[in-house]
C-alpha cells in the first residue's frame, strides 16, 4: 500500500484516526504489510499474518498453507514481521500503537462537533473538534513538498493562542496577528490540543 512509503502511510493513518467516524485497521496494516498481486482476486490482500522470521512467517508449520505467506521482495516476512518491529521503537508497529493510544485520549473526535479551518492552501487540511469546553486541532499536508501557512484556530480569546503538540514537542504560539504560522513537511501532520493540557479540569464546566 502506497509503495511502502512510510511518510504517506503515517499520513493516511493519521488522517483516518482524526476524521469523523470509526477508524478501521485490518491485520497487518499496523506493520505496513504488503499484498501479493500474483494471487487471484481478493486473496492477494488476504495473505497470512507475518509474525516472525520463522518459516512461513511464524504463521503455520504446514508445508502447503492454503494461502502462501509473502516471502519475497520488500514485503517478505523476513523484512516485515511483528517480532522485529516490536523490538524497534521507531517501527511502524510501535508508531501505530502510539497513535492509537493518543486517539483514545482525544474524545473530542468521537463526541464533538467539527469545523474545517481556512489555511489558504488546498494541499493542507485543518480540522478542529470541540467538546465540553475543550478543543483539538489536526493538520495534514497532502503534498510531497513542505508547506508553510498561517491559520487561525477560530477560538476567541487567548486560549486559541497556544497549541500543544500531542505527538512531539513542536508546540505553536500565535503571532501578534492572532494567527499560527506552521511549516508542515511533505506528507506531514500535527495533532494539537488547543490551550493546554488542563482539559480534564474543564470538562465539568459545561
Question: Where in the sequence are the language-model features?
Answer:
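Catalytic and substrate-binding clefts that recognize carbohydrates or anionic sugar/phosphate headgroups
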Residues: 10-13
